[in-house]
A protein has these predicted regions:
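A transmembrane-helix-recognition feature enriched in membrane-embedded lipid enzymes
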Residues: 69-70, 200-247
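Conserved beta-alpha
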Residues: 69-148, 152
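Short Gly/Thr/Asp-enriched flexible loops that form oxyanion-binding sites at enzyme active sites
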Residues: 114, 167-176
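Short, flexible loop segments at boundaries between secondary-structure elements
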Residues: 132-137, 178-216
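Proline-aspartate-enriched helix->loop->beta-strand connector
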Residues: 149, 153-158, 162-163, 179
Length: 247
């Protein structure tokens, strides 16, 4: 399935098609990865051709930013809605039908995550939660990591290394896997672990599509520069997108 490109990145805004693509891949034993595209990795992709190719090499990509969806909807004169990675994550956990593998982040977060998710699906107690050594993306032992995953045989592999590292990691790991769909969903492990300082926005902010603002205040040192880089890149992207839409 080839999605239309928005701001040069393949995105699937149709929730039914997004889920169908993922579930068909799991059913057929296809190896692939899913990227949750928001302002940060979109900005990186439009300033780094290698990373752009990584995003566009995904099985399918969801739009993780409500502001991003609104901007694109305005340009293309159609209602486009974001599909937030945190919601996709909890949906597949609650389905209680897939074997999953949780990879990355810290041992503290993984322990909290396992405890909390096991309350939703008791089978998760028997699933693998593995940290990774801190190193550059090109320095991982991909064959060794893949062997560990292949021996477990999961349907879904959740990867939490932060963007853009996790997307590049999945792209490099893919050739060594026998089956399984990888999801690079960053801080979602933290959201659901109940430990540390990283929390998802409260419900009232989610309803008002203000999760981006919550993240800015929660970790300004990291997120404010990311938003600023997006704002600087946005005029060029809008101009190019409007030209393509008119053409």
């Amino acid at each position: 399935m080839k999605e239309k490109r928005y701001f040069n990145v393949r995105l699937e805004f149709d929730k039914r098609k997004l889920e169908q693509t993922i579930e068909n891949a799991i059913k057929e034993g296809t190896v692939g990865y899913v990227c949750s595209v928001e302002s940060n990795n979109l900005t990186v992709a439009n300033n780094n051709s290698e990373f752009l190719n990584v995003l566009n090499g995904a099985l399918v990509n969801n739009c993780d930013g409500s502001v991003l969806a609104k901007i694109l909807g305005y340009i293309h004169h159609e209602p486009l809605e974001s599909h937030i990675g945190a919601d996709i994550f909890i949906k597949y956990v609650r389905m209680c039908q897939y074997r999953q593998f949780f990879l990355g982040n810290t041992q503290e977060v993984l322990s909290g995550l396992k405890d909390n998710l096991s309350k939703i699906d008791p089978e998760i107690k028997n699933m693998r939660f593995e940290t990774l050594p801190f190193r550059k993306v090109d320095e991982f032992d991909y064959q060794g990591i893949a062997q560990m995953i292949n021996e477990d045989g999961p349907d879904i592999i959740w990867v939490s290394l932060g963007a853009p590292k996790q997307e590049m990691f999945m792209n490099r790991l893919q050739p060594y896997l026998h089956r399984g769909v990888m999801f690079g969903f960053g801080a979602i492990f933290n959201f659901n672990a109940g430990v540390g300082n990283v929390r998802r926005a409260p419900n009232w902010m989610l309803k008002l599509k203000l999760e981006w603002l919550h993240r800015a205040f929660e970790d300004p040192k990291k997120n404010v520069p990311r938003y600023w880089n997006f704002i600087k890149t946005l005029p060029r992207l809008i101009k190019e997108e409007m030209k393509r839409d008119d053409g």
